[in-house]
Design a protein with these regions (language model features):
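Conserved G/P- and acidic residue-centered "switch" motifs that form tight phosphate/ATP-binding loops
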Residues: 51
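ATP/NTP-dependent adenylation/nucleotidyl-transfer catalytic domains that generate, transfer
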Residues: 1-46, 56, 60-64, 68-74, ...
Length: 283
């Protein structure tokens, strides 16, 4: 008989709680260390979608580097909502950071016209990768480092476009679950209009993250925390979770493992990059 996990719901939620003030200090120190100390770069550039993840990263960058050293890029497509643009502007106004708006419609549609019957998923991936192309090009123009904005829940669930959202070399919120992103955002003063709206990639009308994933962020975070702690599905269900949701989350984690790694290299020597050739900073 399987043992019942000694982790009632309130203990699981307690494990997800963060010390927001301490987390802010650590993440701003992390950004200063990664940019200024390790790379000798003083400026950051990030895509600002109007969502909570990029909003929080903008706040962290402004605190770490000073608002004068943070450059946001809004990259709307023709189907992007005006609300998203307005919310991005709220962040710019609140922080006093620089911001450019670069339309990606012509670039995306120019490719899609030559593509073979692009479905909504392919279209969304093209949009995400085009935004990353713009971000890296603008980083070269500005002499600024691109900063990632993906959270841990999305990364574990594989809910991101490979070689797009995961591409920037530094990500201050990649180890924060979505519920922790909400908590830190409230602590740092991100506008409530951004915090309280339903999370959406804004790739098509009426699309929401939770609708795409098939589970709420709160439920996903609770289940993910137990999966990462090593509990089996039956043990997690014994706490009170729906077994179908547990299986959905685990399936997403296991089927997208490849997205969280660099491309697999065939080893033909004892000095393969990222396998044997590692510097101390890589450990």
């Amino acid at each position: 008989m399987l043992p019942v996990v000694d982790a009632p719901l309130h203990r699981i939620d307690a494990a997800l709680k963060i010390d927001a003030a301490l987390t802010e200090r650590w993440l701003t120190a992390f950004l200063r260390d990664e940019l200024i100390e390790r790379r000798r770069i003083t400026k950051a550039v990030l895509g600002l979608s109007g969502g909570i993840d990029s909003a929080l990263v903008a706040f962290l960058c402004a605190r770490a580097l000073g608002p004068e050293n943070v450059h946001a890029i809004r990259m709307p497509y023709r189907t992007s909502s005006q609300d998203s643009l307005d919310d991005a502007q709220r962040i710019v106004d609140a922080l006093g950071i620089k911001c450019d708006t670069i339309e990606i419609t012509d670039a995306v549609d120019g490719y899609l016209r030559a593509a073979h019957e692009p479905d909504p998923r392919r279209r969304g991936n093209v949009m995400a990768r085009m935004r990353m192309l713009v971000l890296f090009d603008q980083s070269a123009r500005l002499g600024a480092l691109p900063i990632g904005t993906g959270n841990k829940t999305e990364r574990m669930m594989g809910y991101f476009t490979w070689h797009a959202d995961d591409t920037p070399p530094v990500n201050p919120i990649g180890d924060l679950f979505k519920t922790q992103v909400w908590a830190l955002s409230r602590h740092m003063g991100v506008p409530l209009e951004v915090i309280d709206k339903p999370p959406s990639a804004d790739l098509e009308a009426n699309q929401t993250d939770e609708g795409d994933m098939g589970v709420t962020y709160l439920t996903a975070d609770r289940i993910l925390s137990q999966i990462l702690a090593g509990y089996r599905d039956e043990q997690i269900a014994a706490v009170g979770f729906d077994l179908r949701e547990i299986e959905l989350v685990r399936r997403r984690v296991e089927s997208t493992h490849w997205k969280r790694h660099l491309p697999t290299t065939a080893l033909v020597s004892g000095t393969a990059i990222n396998e044997f050739y590692l510097r101390p900073v890589d450990y």
